[in-house]
């Protein structure tokens, strides 16, 4: 009998969560899924995901992504190496940059990378009435209609630079991050979702604690902090946007 993949914790304090989101426009929901399903998702990301890459080096550069199987070829692998070096240069000059491992749930679903596989089922769960109902209740946004998403792994030396997520015209209303890394993540290992004020000070930071769901209204200035070379594991997550169209 297959293991359940995505079951919400039935004891979530929905009214309290909605109050906090209305107050600050961001929150972290701990123990959002049942322990069993969160562990199953973590195993899928750690052991059953064909990881590609996502890279951008400068605000004027276009995001670059590559599927895992393409990275086995010499020419694309060399291009990835050069683009990673470019992200160092961009970040050093105070320009926007990011690099991390990625698997697009939406592209995989539409292009039938693994039809009926766990990643397809996960995207369906993210758009099912149970999850979308929780999201509408917590955010106070009854017009949310769908969720997109991708799996991400911020491994050693990966980061996401400060930016806004200002794609309001595309229907982005709320960003979400479902954290699925190891249980005892340590602060020195980075990978925090942080929010900045206008002076560049950090207002709030969320540890990527296992089985927690970060939600924040967009646009807000935020980043994912650098994961250092001594981090023992990657920061696994499912991320995306809740949309009104």
Where are each of the predicted segments found?
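Fe(II)/2-oxoglutarate oxygenase catalytic core
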Residues: 1-214, 219-245
């Amino acid at each position: 009998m297959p293991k359940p993949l995505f079951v919400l914790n039935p004891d979530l304090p929905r009214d309290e969560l909605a109050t906090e989101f209305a107050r600050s426009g961001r929150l972290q929901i701990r123990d959002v899924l049942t322990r069993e399903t969160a562990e199953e998702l973590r195993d899928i990301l750690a052991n059953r995901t064909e990881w590609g890459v996502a890279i951008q080096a400068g605000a004027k550069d276009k995001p670059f992504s590559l599927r895992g199987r393409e990275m086995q070829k010499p020419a694309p692998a060399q291009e990835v190496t050069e683009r990673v070096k470019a992200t160092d240069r961009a970040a050093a000059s105070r320009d926007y940059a990011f690099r991390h491992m990625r698997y697009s749930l939406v592209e995989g679903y539409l292009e039938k990378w693994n039809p009926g596989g766990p990643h397809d089922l996960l995207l369906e769960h993210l758009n099912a009435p149970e999850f979308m109902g929780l999201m509408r209740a917590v955010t106070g946004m009854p017009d949310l209609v769908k969720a997109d998403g991708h799996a991400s792994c911020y491994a050693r030396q990966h980061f996401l630079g400060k930016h806004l997520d200002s794609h309001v015209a595309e229907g982005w209303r709320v960003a979400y991050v479902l954290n699925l890394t190891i249980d005892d993540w340590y602060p020195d290992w980075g990978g925090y979702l942080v929010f900045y004020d206008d002076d560049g000070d950090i207002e709030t930071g969320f540890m990527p604690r296992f089985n927690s769901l970060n939600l924040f209204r967009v646009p807000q200035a935020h980043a994912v902090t650098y994961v250092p070379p001594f981090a023992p594991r990657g920061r696994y997550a499912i991320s995306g946007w809740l949309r009104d169209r």
